[in-house]
Amino acid sequence: MNPPRITAFHALTHRVRWRIFAFLFAFAFIAYFQQKGLTVAAERIMPDLGISQVQVGWLEWAFVLGYAAFQFPGGVIGQRLGARVTFTLIGIVAFLATVLTPLAPRLLQGSALFLMLFALQLLMGLAQAGIFPVGSGVMEAWFRPEKWAIIQGVQTMGMQFAAAATPPIVALLMSSVGWQKALFWPALPAIVVIALWAWYGRNTPNEHPSVSAAELAELDPRSLQQSPTTISGRRIMQVLANRSILLLTVSYVCMNYVFYLIGNWCFLYLVQERHFNILESGWLAMIPPLAAGLGGGIGGKLVAVLVDRFGIRWGFRLLPMLALPTSGTLILVAVNLNNPYGAVGALALAYAVLELNEGAFWGATMYIARSDTMSATGVLNTGGNIGGLIGIPIVAYLSGGGHWTAAFVIGTVLALLGAVMWMGIDADKSIG
């Protein structure tokens, strides 16, 4: 039986699932604002605290280490505790790590300060690791399969819009109140969102008192019949041994080297290699993530159209096989352009084309894993952040020596390799 037809406006205003998704969007936005602040403030932090660019790279690496290491455990914990409790814990710990970072220099200095900053970045990574795996499990429970790639794309918009907003906001605040307050004050709204989620959020539609019978009828019966909190060692091993999930993970490693290259290093690249000043770099550095946010939203819809037209297997394959090589080519174009503004435009386009693929990666994993989506996307995003673990020290070393072009060439090669992996991925074969 087909779900009842309702208007898009009525769904957005009267359906609880869209309010739940609004929280997921907000979590992604807040998480990326918290993550990117240190990178933008690095140009002021380095001379103020006597920290080198390589050390800044290690601070970013500490976050990615915690973030990568706890992706899969975070997904498993999310399945065990449920999204309501897990997101509340994530929010509290990440908030504390964020606000303690600018306060640490008041108490410590030298090596002790660097170790404290390293520990706080590691803690933030551990805390935030579960956001996207647990969020994907919420999407699996609250939305029909044909919407998964679309809403994953929209969530990508949230995180990229935060990445776009961070450079100008932090740069402007640094110019007026200093880098410490620039990192502290924007963190405070997160507390309100966490409190609202703890009050309103639920793990599944069946648990929410405001979900009507009409809304339940619109949802996927298979998702409603499964409990996301049941997890066993056997099911974990099925996730870890699945060929398509492993290939998705390897491909995501390759893609995320490029993701971190543009997302984390664009600001410093514009300052050091293209010789823009701090404020202008702050404004220009928001262009690539804005473009990437639009790319994420468009990509989710494109995947849905392709799946409807070509079926699940090729519908998910086609976009990454085309978009990843295109993005890799565009970053080479960017670093070889003489016009600095043209380089910004090429980087923005490369990032947008790269982020077209988010809906394909996450949506395919959800199709394969179904009720084990939290664990499976934890595996996927572990791979994605291994790309960052590999890439951050490489880019820090190469950029510190002025060899930015070499860092971008590596990205081109990995983008091509990531596209090849998709030939072996079949999202039409689910686990179990």
Q: Model regions: which residues?
A:
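Helix-loop-helix hairpin linking two adjacent transmembrane segments in secondary transporters
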Residues: Q155-H208
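Extracytoplasmic
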Residues: R19-Q53, I262-F267
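Residue-level signature of mid-helix packing/kink "hotspots" within the transmembrane helices
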Residues: K36, V64-F72, A129, A163-A164, ...
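C-terminal ends and interior cores of transmembrane alpha-helices
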Residues: I92-G110, P325-N338
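Hydrophobic core of transmembrane alpha-helices in multi-pass small-molecule transporters
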Residues: A97, A112-G130, Y341-L356
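Extracytoplasmic gate region of multi-pass secondary transporters
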Residues: L38-V40, A241-G297, E358, W362
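C-terminal transmembrane helical hairpin of 12-TM major facilitator-type secondary transporters
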Residues: R313-A360
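Cytoplasmic helix-loop-helix junction between adjacent transmembrane helices
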Residues: L120-M159
